[in-house]
């Protein structure tokens, strides 16, 4: 059976021992949330009131548990709202992975609704633009931590 991008993300999170993720749902990550529901016996999702809170919660969780903090946000303002929490974790060498959505590949560079190049805002990001690159990128991040 061929897995889609959301299923690949969930499988790798479980494989890497992730049992808790923080986030705030939005249009471009709804497929991830659909899959997380199917994994709710293995991954607990903590819903926050704002993406920035989710980012700081993932940072705090990583500091308190020694595990990698994982945060999920949608495209555009959802992803930019993660920046302060990501920067805090980065500056203190706290292991954290952010999963964000984006507009469809065909819409990139066309000033689409909620299109933001988050990689340009966060220099320590390894962006993924296709399902085939998701496993490599996630394994790279988890191997760093």
What are the roles of these predicted feature ranges?
Residues 1-145:
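N-terminal alpha/beta PP-like core and its mobile active-site loop of ThDP/TPP-dependent enzymes
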């Amino acid at each position: 059976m061929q897995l889609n991008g959301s299923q690949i993300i969930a499988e790798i999170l479980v494989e890497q021992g992730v049992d808790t993720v923080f986030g705030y749902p939005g249009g471009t990550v709804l497929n991830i949330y659909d899959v997380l529901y199917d994994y709710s016996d293995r991954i607990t999702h903590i819903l926050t009131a704002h993406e920035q809170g989710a980012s700081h919660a993932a940072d705090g969780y990583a500091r308190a548990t020694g595990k990698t903090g994982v945060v999920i946000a949608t495209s555009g303002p959802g992803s930019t709202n993660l920046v302060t929490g990501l920067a805090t974790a980065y500056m203190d060498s706290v292991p954290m992975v952010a999963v964000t959505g984006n507009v469809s590949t065909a819409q990139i560079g066309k000033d689409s609704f909620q299109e933001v190049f988050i990689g340009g805002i966060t220099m320590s990001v390894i962006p993924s633009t296709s399902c085939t690159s998701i496993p490599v990128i996630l394994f790279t991040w988890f191997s760093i931590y």
